């Protein structure tokens, strides 16, 4: 199409017909003044889109290669733009298709990597790809290194040469000389974690604990000298540690206070050692018989250091008046 004025002169440049703008291309050397149609055209350093009828387009414009966005004056936007409450990036550095919307990819922009959905919207938060997970901040920037997300620690591996920033979910990984342990969902393990060989404990920093740890009011020993499984929790046994014997229950807790075994009761002091002889517990006297492996005496008479004492069924030493059969004792 061409347009001539009333005098028969060929018109070129912008032309408003009704409410619609058209462009008559005076620089078309083969067909000067031909109306631009069904194309993207650079005019005075700006890009414009025209539909098949030649009408200048505004808003979102779909072409075979993807989407563009034009302002109300028809000029394509480039760079970051918030459209309809979402962020898009129209790539002015795309040599083949200038100002084409970035979609369905990771893209480095001014040194920072961003994620874009197939719809072109910038994404934030967790992003899943075939190789695994990445994370982007609320402003869209891909992050690297340690990150606390919803009170859990994750490591986005900046040293992964194939997939920089990929979330680590290996069972263990050495980072800056320290070994850390991760769940399958990528969260750094803190606290107790069970493996086929037994239990381990990771400190709040994520470092596997060795030696003594007090957890929820109980003492545990993580055996750093276990050559096969360093840091494995000691359970259900006695163990000599620094020349002192300690006793551990099936859950690994060091025995403290009353402990029942094979129908007999024993008492372990706060240091983890079995009490022997007389023991006052909460104002009540008990006798842990050193001649019988420190078992608590209960339910009868017992001579201690030449004197007779009576212990009831709970092991408590009787005081004041005591009826035994038809006899009374004091």
List the predicted regions and their residue ranges.
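Extracellular adhesion/carbohydrate-binding repeat motifs centered on closely spaced tryptophans
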Residues: 1-330
